[in-house]
């Protein structure tokens, strides 16, 4: 039994020694351990940020953005603040950190995360950026992780590697320390007045900076890019523009415009207007009474070509010279202020008796008969057109002749004339309209009214009428004209 006990104790001691040797190996590795260079040489930036935020900053940096910067070459990282709302972004220099070991990436990221934490928690009391608050968190994280976070970086060689554009001053400052007149930059931006030290340099030195170094084939690459970019733009701009030597052909206006609804097949055709919608119906005469058209009346537009005639939709016609003559005779547009066409009689405008203007009319009985006959012929033609529009839908047999029965337009004067004529017939009971309640002008003598001896001339029949009876007399004259049209 003693031998067995001794053997058991020996085995227990050996086991304890093995366990004691394994315990240090089970401790977590440091964030900057050298073994990470082989295990994870290029870590995920966003993954590291989420891990460090949970372990060292209590999840306070969830609203902070972290990303790589491909143009930043002067510093390893930067933290940009955006107001007091807790929004900020961390940018790390990809050109500098991709040449450095993983340890530098971790330390730079933790450095910028401390700046973001101080800003988010409104504890940014460090006016210089790396004050006591920053150093407190920096030492805390260094003790927990074994890292060596500092307030500066030592990537000077990498920074100089990207400064490939050099300038040197040709003035006295080229012999003074510490720069000896050199200006080295990563971008092709020559020293100018935009630099904060430019004014002082002009006072003390006054020299000119001359470029002495740039990357290989930099000028050739720049010229090639500019040529490739400018050629398509210049071609696109000058594509639709004529050359300066060429003259633009100016085509004068021929006087013929475009008809609404016209297609390319009708471009060579000749446009004519016709009042007949049915082809078998005879056209109206071409005298003044037939050509008197209202602007709102609808006529059919035909296009004559070498082949068979084609019809288009109904459109408003363009009044010809004969139409305009009839309208000008019936609807006089001469102003009453014209001394040639009118004269003042007892304060009322009366048409002048002089002959010479085509729009003035004589007050003689013969001229009145001519005016009355022209009005009668005009109204007869309008009445014939109205009957034509009413009877066409019944006679039209083809699909082109079928027109839907529509209510007459309110603007049509013919419709109003026929409406008032029918209304007067219904009121008079079929009797003669001339036997209306309006007496003739002779019966309404101005002598009947005492104290009112002022007499004016009627603008329609040129009779002398009392000023108090002129409105009733005008109504009677208009009714007489409508009666003549009816007869």
UniProtKB/Swiss-Prot annotation:
One GO term (biological process): S-adenosylmethionine biosynthetic process
UniProt-listed Enzyme Commission number(s): 3.4.24.-
Ranges of biased composition (kind: Low complexity): 435-453
Annotated catalytic residues: 112
Function, as annotated: DNA-dependent metalloendopeptidase that mediates the proteolytic cleavage of covalent DNA-protein cross-links (DPCs) during DNA synthesis, thereby playing a key role in maintaining genomic integrity. DPCs are highly toxic DNA lesions that interfere with essential chromatin transactions, such as replication and transcription, and which are induced by reactive agents, such as UV light or formaldehyde. Associates with the DNA replication machinery and specifically removes DPCs during DNA synthesis.
Signal among keywords: no
Protein known as: DNA-dependent metalloprotease SPRTN
Zinc finger boundaries on the chain: UBZ4-type: 455-482
Biased composition (Basic residues): 220-230
GO cellular component: chromatin; nuclear speck; nucleus
Amino acids binding Zn(2+) 1: 111, 115, 130
Motif Nuclear localization signal mapped to chain: 401-412
Quaternary structure annotation from Swiss-Prot or TrEMBL: Homodimer. Interacts (VIA PIP-box) with PCNA (when ubiquitinated). Interacts (via its SHP-box) with VCP/p97. Interacts with RAD18. Interacts with KCTD13 and POLD3.
Motif PIP-box mapped to chain: 324-331
Amino acid composition bias (Basic and acidic residues), ranges on this chain: 236-247
Modified residues annotated as N6-acetyllysine in this record: 230
Domain SprT-like: 45-212
GO MF: double-stranded DNA binding; K63-linked polyubiquitin modification-dependent protein binding; metalloendopeptidase activity; methionine adenosyltransferase activity; polyubiquitin modification-dependent protein binding; single-stranded DNA binding; ubiquitin binding; zinc ion binding
UniProt biased composition (Polar residues): 280-289, 306-317
Source organism (scientific name): Bos taurus (Bovine)
PTM description: Autocatalytically cleaved in response to double-stranded DNA-binding: autocatalytic cleavage takes place in trans and leads to inactivation. Monoubiquitinated; monoubiquitination promotes exclusion from chromatin. Deubiquitinated by VCPIP1: deubiquitination is required for subsequent acetylation and recruitment to chromatin and DNA damage sites.
